[in-house]
A protein has these predicted regions:
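Non-cleavable N-terminal signal-anchor transmembrane helices
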Residues: 1-4, 98
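Sec-dependent N-terminal signal peptides
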Residues: 3-13
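Short S/T/G/P-rich N-terminal loop/turn motif that feeds into the first structured element of a domain
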Residues: 18-184
Length: 184
C-alpha cells in the first residue's frame, strides 16, 4: 500500500512539474508587423505617441517595438508586436487601430516617415526554435517564415518536419505558428 501511495504521489508530482503551461500573462493572440525604418528614433516616437494617446492608453494594451537584425527573408529592420488576452481583445485592438483618431495619426506619420511595411502575405507559417527554456521566456530565437498558399497540402509536410527534428535536444523548444496579416 505504501508503494502505491508513493507511486501515485510521484506520478502526480511529475504531472504538475511537466504540465508545460505558459507563464502567467503570456498571450497567444498577437499582431506582429515587420517594417523597414531608416530613422529608428522617429519611428519609436510615432509608436510612443500612438501608445500614449488617451483612446489607446485606456485599453491597457501590451506592445513591443524592436529591432530586427536579420530575419533572412526580407529587408525588415524593425517590428511591432501587440499582445492580447483574448480573441475579443485582439479584434478590438485591430478595430481601434483602424478606426481611432490615434490610429489615423499614427498611419499618417508612418507615411510621412516613408516606413515600408514588409508583412504583405495573407498567411505566413513560422517555425521557431528558442535558445533554451520556454519560448515565452526566451529572448533569442531562430525563425523561418514561409508563404503557404495551400495549408491543406502544407500540413503533412509540417508533420513530417516535426517528426524529423525529434532527435535534437532543442526540439522541445521548437514551435509552429500560423500568422494572418491583416495588412501592412
Amino acid at each position: 500500500m505504501k508503494k502505491i501511495i508513493l507511486s501515485s504521489f510521484l506520478i502526480a508530482s511529475f504531472g504538475l512539474l511537466a504540465d508545460d503551461h505558459l507563464p502567467p500573462g503570456y498571450s497567444k493572440y498577437q499582431s506582429n508587423f515587420l517594417f523597414t525604418c531608416s530613422m529608428p528614433a522617429k519611428c519609436l516616437k510615432a509608436f510612443n505617441d500612438y501608445m500614449n494617446a488617451p483612446e489607446i492608453v485606456s485599453q491597457n494594451f501590451e506592445a513591443d517595438m524592436y529591432a530586427v537584425m536579420h530575419n533572412g527573408w526580407d529587408e525588415a529592420t524593425h517590428g511591432i508586436s501587440f499582445y492580447y488576452k483574448s480573441a475579443d481583445e485582439y479584434a478590438k485592438g485591430n478595430q481601434i487601430y483602424v478606426t481611432s483618431e490615434a490610429g489615423r495619426k499614427f498611419r499618417k506619420r508612418i507615411d510621412e516617415l516613408d516606413i515600408q511595411g514588409t508583412s504583405q502575405n495573407l498567411t505566413v507559417h513560422t517555425v521557431g526554435v528558442t535558445n533554451s527554456g520556454s519560448a515565452a521566456e526566451n529572448v533569442v530565437s531562430l525563425r523561418w517564415s514561409l508563404d503557404v498558399s495551400n495549408p491543406a497540402k502544407f500540413l503533412p509536410l509540417w508533420k513530417g518536419f516535426s517528426k524529423s527534428i525529434e532527435k535534437y535536444d532543442w526540439s522541445a523548444n521548437a514551435y509552429g505558428l500560423q500568422s494572418h496579416y491583416l495588412g501592412n
